[in-house]
Amino acid sequence: MKYVDGFVVAVPADKKDAYREMAAKAAPLFKEFGALRIVECWASDVPDGKVTDFRMAVKAEENEEVVFSWIEYPSKEVRDAANQKMMSDPRMKEFGESMPFDGKRMIYGGFESIIDE
């Protein structure tokens, strides 16, 4: 059963290119570690909610946009093994030092796929 890691993060609008560059460099590493697919999406139609919304969820500031992304794996076991490899790979550590967003406000989690058509 496919397993998906989902992420939502606020990125300063003027760092869109830097984010895209970082994501493009990271994608092959995720695939090397077992990911099937990596998708990164920049907000274009994200309405403000009355109780909650994407912007509130990541405490996006006025100058920030929301990025919604996910990584697909063939199984949770492959994902767990990939996470272990990533944590010890020096190439991944470089990303942690130069991320163009505040990682403390990122929300993320792992999800079992229940419908995939």
UniProtKB/Swiss-Prot annotation:
This is Uncharacterized protein YbaA. Gene3D superfamilies: 3.30.70.100. Coiled coil: none annotated. Pfam families: DUF1428. It comes from the Bacteria.
